[in-house]
């Protein structure tokens, strides 16, 4: 039976480098591919080596005392849960286990009162040390994945050389089999396409047209998703004509304006709008009530959680006092204790090393004791007096009371209400048009005064809008109203009596509109707006007369001539006649009038105009030049005169000085 070789063992430096290169190429998921490059290691061992040692995120620095203390406290809280402890400390689980074992072994050598080995934990970390525990010859190397790599030998084995060469060849090949096959297929398709194009070009040169499409009819009818766009809607070419839409919109607007002008806005729309507003107000009110209810429930939950936290609080356990009254010397004696000495002693008394030693001893003591399940006589458990937890009904009543007290305190802060009740009575004008309320308003006595007034205000606004629609069309369309004095007087002798009446009525209406909307100071007789009944009667009479009138029907004329040979011959003969007439008229004009004389006079006039333009241009240039020279001369004259004035002033000053000197000399 051949020997079975088990993969594993110490990791060498060559294997580590191969593993790093393989991870950089294959990633952190294809461990079977990575392990295929390593002859003596499996996929699980390769993954463990990367996660335990080669990962650059691993902290391999020396353990600090704070980390040791944290490790011991976590080992006490989470026994044997090293996978959970490792991410909290920031190291691997294996390193945590080894450090924990090292700390337990170090406590065997340290006495309870001895201080000679206090600094034993300051040496190198577990990473640079051999396996923990007492190692003997022949012992197994546990967790080789978390140990440093074995250095390479100068003369490597043939097996290692073969593994290194194979890994180098495979890792250098960045293009796999699939990529090579795809590239080869693309090259074949390109060569086929080029050969087909060459064949088609040769056949076309020979006079034979061959299509590149498939010859299969079924295949040819399928949709080509590479060539075409599915569900494509092509827009119309050029500018889109929207004249029809604009005309339809205009007609619809005119129809609506006519309907409103004749019938007015129906009250049903106003009622629906008012009903919609009431529904929205009710909905907002309900939402506000729901929100307040939710806030109350949230406040109740907060109170409940707070009470639960208070119930869960445990009794505060303080450490035993270090100094008692018996050991403390009396005040004022020579052996009294200084306060500063006590504070420094208390602060340095329990250092980090002492805490680490205490924690390790306690852990070892717990490991030494047998389980309570295996012991014959179980130790008596001290009875602790615990406060009974209140029932759910009591808790519910308690937080309800707290919420009610909170609400009462908030309501108590509100200001006192002002009960000033007043009734606003509507004032009615006797000349005003009577407004009929709806049946709902008249019959329902439960509607309050504010709602009734609001309905009356809506009806009043509706009447105002109807009154605006009964004005003249010029005012409704906001057209400019001309001044009455700018109107032209018509000739009464040439117009009929009906036209004269229409003109007078139009003038009176124009004066009234001008005084109402343009110039209130303009004095004229104002015309009151028609009431709704008169307006309806007038519109009915106009529509009745329009219905009785016969509308003139215009026959549509075609702008195209019939396309026949007879019509074409008539058009050609007509064109010949027009051509002969135009030539005869041209000959008669040329015979009676000397055209050359007109051309000569035209040329002379153009020449004179050109000469005058040139002279005008030169005169303009000279004028600009002389103007510029004048400006420069004025500036220079001003500067020269200023300079000469300064010289004269200097001469006068010098003359005065000389005269003073002469006077002084004469006096001396």
From Swiss-Prot:
GO cellular component: cytoplasm; Prp19 complex; spliceosomal complex
Keyword Coiled coil: yes
Biased composition (Acidic residues): 152-161
Signal peptide: none
Protein name (database record): Pre-mRNA-splicing factor CEF1
Complex and partners: Associated with the spliceosome.
Domain HTH myb-type residue range list: 1-58, 60-108
Recorded superkingdom: Eukaryota
DNA-binding region, residue range(s): 31-54, 82-104
Keywords from the UniProt entry: Coiled coil, Cytoplasm, DNA-binding, mRNA processing, mRNA splicing, Nucleus, Repeat, Spliceosome
Ranges of biased composition (kind: Basic and acidic residues): 270-289
GO molecular-function terms, A-Z: DNA binding
One BP annotation, GO: mRNA splicing, via spliceosome
């Amino acid at each position: 039976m051949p020997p079975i070789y088990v993969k594993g063992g110490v990791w060498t430096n060559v294997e580590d480098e191969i593993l790093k290169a393989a991870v950089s190429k294959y990633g952190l998921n294809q461990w079977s591919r990575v392990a295929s490059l390593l002859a003596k290691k499996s996929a699980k061992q390769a993954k463990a080596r990367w996660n335990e040692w080669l990962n650059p995120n691993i902290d391999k620095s020396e353990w600090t005392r704070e980390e040791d203390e944290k490790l011991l406290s976590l080992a006490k809280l989470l026994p044997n849960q090293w996978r959970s402890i490792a991410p909290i400390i920031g190291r691997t689980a294996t390193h945590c286990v080894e450090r924990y074992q090292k700390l337990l072994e170090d406590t065997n050598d340290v006495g309870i009162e001895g201080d000679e080995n206090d600094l034993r934990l300051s040496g190198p970390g577990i990473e640079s040390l051999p396996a923990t525990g007492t190692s003997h010859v022949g012992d197994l190397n546990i967790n080789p994945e978390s140990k440093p790599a074995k250095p390479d030998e100068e003369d490597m084995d043939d097996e290692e050389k073969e593994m290194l060469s194979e890994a180098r060849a495979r890792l250098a090949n960045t293009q796999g089999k699939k990529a090579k096959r795809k590239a080869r297929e693309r090259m074949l398709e390109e060569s086929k396409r080029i050969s087909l194009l060459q064949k088609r070009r040769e056949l076309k040169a020979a006079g034979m047209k061959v299509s590149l499409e498939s010859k299969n009819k079924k295949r040819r009818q399928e949709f080509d998703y590479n060539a075409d766009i599915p569900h494509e809607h092509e827009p119309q070419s050029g500018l889109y004509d929207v004249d029809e839409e604009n005309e339809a919109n205009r007609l619809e607007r005119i129809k609506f304006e006519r309907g409103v002008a004749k019938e007015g806005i129906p009250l049903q729309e106003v009622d629906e709008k008012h009903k919609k507003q009431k529904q929205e107000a009710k909905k907002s009110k309900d939402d506000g009530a729901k929100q307040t209810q939710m806030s109350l429930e949230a406040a109740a939950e907060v109170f409940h959680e707070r009470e639960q936290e208070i119930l869960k609080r445990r009794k505060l356990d303080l450490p035993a006092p270090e100094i008692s009254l018996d050991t403390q010397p009396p005040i004022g004696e020579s052996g009294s204790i200084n306060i500063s000495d006590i504070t420094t002693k208390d602060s340095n008394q329990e250092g980090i090393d002492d805490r680490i030693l205490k924690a390790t001893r306690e852990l070892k003591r717990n490991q030494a004791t047998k389980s309570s399940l295996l012991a014959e006589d179980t130790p008596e458990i001290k009875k602790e007096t615990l406060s009974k937890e209140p029932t759910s009904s009591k808790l519910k009543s308690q937080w309800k009371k707290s919420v009610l007290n909170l609400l009462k305190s908030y309501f108590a802060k509100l200001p006192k209400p002002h009960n000033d009740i007043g009734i606003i009575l509507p004032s009615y004008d006797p000349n005003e048009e009577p407004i009929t309320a709806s049946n709902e308003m008249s019959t329902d006595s439960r509607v309050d005064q504010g709602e009734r007034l609001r309905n009356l205000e809506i009806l009043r606004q509706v009447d105002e809008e109807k009154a605006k629609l009964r004005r003249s069309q010029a005012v409704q369309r906001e057209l400019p109203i001309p001044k009455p004095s700018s109107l032209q007087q018509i000739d009464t002798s040439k117009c009929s009596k009906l036209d004269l009446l229409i003109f007078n009525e139009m003038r009176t209406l124009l004066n009234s509109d001008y005084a109402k909307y343009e110039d209130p100071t303009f004095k004229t007789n104002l015309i009151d707006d028609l009431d709704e009944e008169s307006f309806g009667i007038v519109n009915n009479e106009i529509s009745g007369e329009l219905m009785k009138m016969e509308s003139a029907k215009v026959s549509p004329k075609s702008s195209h001539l019939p396309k026949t040979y007879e019509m074409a011959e008539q058009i050609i003969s007509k064109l010949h006649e027009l051509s002969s007439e135009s030539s005869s008229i041209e000959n008669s004009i040329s015979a009676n009038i000397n055209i050359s004389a007109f051309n000569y006079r035209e040329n002379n006039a153009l020449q004179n105009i050109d000469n005058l333009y040139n002279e005008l241009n030169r005169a303009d240039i000279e004028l600009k030049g002389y103007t510029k020279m004048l400006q420069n001369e004025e500036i220079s004259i001003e500067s020269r005169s200023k300079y000469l004035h300064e010289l004269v002033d200097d001469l006068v000053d010098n003359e005065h000085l000389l005269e003073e000197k002469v006077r002084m000399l004469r006096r001396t």
